[in-house]
Structures are given as structure tokens and as C-alpha cells.
């Protein structure tokens, strides 16, 4: 990512999902999407926002792009997924931010 421009994003989804295997009783919140990146060494991920959302039923996440490895210009869509253990009905929605700008608002 270069500069402070808000990156293009697409294909957002958020859902509560059940655990698998020995974890079948667990519930997880899964958030996924894609972000347009311009360098081969850029990797997108989501982190919990600090401070959190002022609405207790809305989870606020930050879209972060880190760099790793050799640099090389190449425009591409990079997908990512974030999972967080939760309980049923903990959240009504998810808000995804990029440097203080909302890039997605998702209902559960």
C-alpha cells in the first residue's frame, strides 16, 4: 500500500459458524473479504480495533496490510479470513475500518 489512500475492497462476508472436530460446541465469528494490493510482498489481515466500537453489539475490526518478503509491483486482489471465538448472538454486526475510514459494514 502506498500513501494514505483507502484501498479498494470487495466480497465481504461475516457469519457465526460452529466449531468442528473436538470443538463442535464452540461458536466462531468468521469475517472474510478481499483487498486490492499493488505489491507482491503485501499481506492483508484483520485485527480488533482499539478502541473498540462504542456500540457493544458491533465488533469493530481494522484492516491492516503488512509487508513480508521481496518487493515487486503487481496489482492483485488478496483474500483474507479472520476467526474469533464468540457465543451465539454476541454481535449484531461487524464494522471494518482502514485508518479510521469505514470500508465495510456487515450485518450478522
Residue ranges and their predicted role:
Residues 1-108:
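Exposed, flexible binding/inhibitory loops of compact, secreted disulfide-stabilized domains
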